[in-house]
Amino acid sequence: MASIPATVATVAQANMVAPFTGLKSNAAFPVTKKVNDFSTLPSNGGRVQCMKVWPPLGKKRYETLSYLPNLTEVQLAKEVDYLLRNKWVPCLEFELEHGFVYRENARSPGYYDGRYWTMWKLPMFGCTDSAQVMKELQECKKEYPQAWIRIIGFDNVRQVQCISFIASKPDGF
């Protein structure tokens, strides 16, 4: 039989909690006084002259980067490389009639038609090279030359679409 040392607490040890002494004085905390001096506020006043306003009439906005001129093959490949570096799954979608959101079936605020496009094949799980995506883009263009085609980056961990941009537009758009 092994002997186990016994621990016995005395009454004095059981009541060893420090007494409450009240709240501390505010004088112990440092105080910074704010000065109403507007000379240090940030300003872009010097740059306003060189800014331009996007004309809202007659210009369709599609996706990210849609306000830029059409991207070249090299620029598209760089965007796809960015997508792959972030471990997003590339996916191609196309639309034959409307490459932009529009209202046809409902007039309620916040509802738009044209947000869901047809997927080109399957998402490219395991894709590691932008050349693979560019090859699929060329196939989609060959099959549907008058379609809007966009490239999407899908995060399969968070299950969200992280990037989407137009890769090809029909002639005249």
Curated annotation (Swiss-Prot):
A Pfam family recorded for this sequence: RuBisCO_small
Listed GO CC annotations: chloroplast
Localization in the cell: Plastid, Chloroplast
Transit peptide start and end: 1-49
Coiled coil: none
Cross-referenced InterPro entries: RuBisCO_ssu, RuBisCO_ssu_dom, RuBisCO_ssu_N, RuBisCO_ssu_sf
GO biological process, one term: photorespiration
SMART domains per UniProt: RuBisCO_small (SM00961)
Main location: plastid
Keywords of the record: Calvin cycle, Carbon dioxide fixation, Chloroplast, Photorespiration, Photosynthesis, Plastid, Transit peptide
Keyword Chloroplast included in the entry's annotation: yes
Disulfide-linked positions: none
Gene3D superfamilies: Ribulose bisphosphate carboxylase, small subunit
N-terminal signal peptide: none
Gene Ontology molecular-function annotations: ribulose-bisphosphate carboxylase activity
Note: The basic functional RuBisCO is composed of a large chain homodimer in a 'head-to-tail' conformation. In form I RuBisCO this homodimer is arranged in a barrel-like tetramer with the small subunits forming a tetrameric 'cap' on each end of the 'barrel'.
Assembly information from the UniProt record: Heterohexadecamer of 8 large and 8 small subunits.
Similarity comment: family membership: Belongs to the RuBisCO small chain family.
Known function: RuBisCO catalyzes two reactions: the carboxylation of D-ribulose 1,5-bisphosphate, the primary event in carbon dioxide fixation, as well as the oxidative fragmentation of the pentose substrate. Both reactions occur simultaneously and in competition at the same active site. Although the small subunit is not catalytic it is essential for maximal activity.
Name of the protein this chain belongs to: Ribulose bisphosphate carboxylase small subunit, chloroplastic 5
Organism: Flaveria pringlei
